[in-house]
Amino acid sequence: MPPVWNFITDFGDSAVTLPLALLVLIFLFAAGSRRLALAWMLAIGSCGAVIGALKILFGACGHELTFVHLTSPSGHTAMSTAVYGSLALLIGARLPLGQRRTILAATAIVIVGIAVSRVALHDHSRSEIALGFAVGVGAAALFRAALRRYAAPALPLGWLLIGGGVLVAVMHGTRWLIEPAVHRLALDFRLDLPFCR
């Protein structure tokens, strides 16, 4: 397997997305935008909670749901869509339409790249990618609704981008072993669910 897929997929690891989400949260609180900061926590937190719950639910079956090819929804895809997507919406909120579209398009390319890498590495099926993407889009939509209600603060975008870039560069390649922990938890919840058969 070409190493480029591992390089791309590492941008979606929780070791990158979660610290980046925390950095954005700090910037929002520092800018005095408490409501948007809370909305950010709700959006990213709900994404993590939902994808975690789905992983446990499907993992409790102990085998692939053959009719939809589902074993474990893609957390990389979900969190990448939520974090990178919401960050793009936040950065673009105070920019001209043309620049906003450019940022959203570039972000979409990154998210799609991460999603494709999960399939290329045989870590997830297309159905698992689609479900992860849907969860991430839901989280980003939640944050977008908050952006429409509360004005985006004048963040120091230069410092945010520098800080985010340094953080991603430092954490890229680090892998937090969340998936095995979720799998073990799923085994504890092994249930005889009708849709597992």
Predicted feature residues:
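Short helix-capping/hinge motifs at transmembrane helix termini and TM-loop junctions
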Residues: A31, F58-G59, H122
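Hydrophobic alpha-helical transmembrane segments
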Residues: G12-F29, M79
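Alpha-helical transmembrane segments in multi-pass membrane proteins
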Residues: A39-C47, I51, K55, G132, ...
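Membrane-embedded catalytic cores of phosphoryl/pyrophosphoryl-handling enzymes
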Residues: R34, E64-A181
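Helical transmembrane-bundle signal
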Residues: V24, G48, G52, I111-A115
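Interfacial segments of alpha-helical transmembrane regions
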Residues: I26-S46
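N-terminal transmembrane-helix/juxtamembrane module of multi-pass inner/ER membrane proteins
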Residues: M1-L20, I51-H69, T174-R197
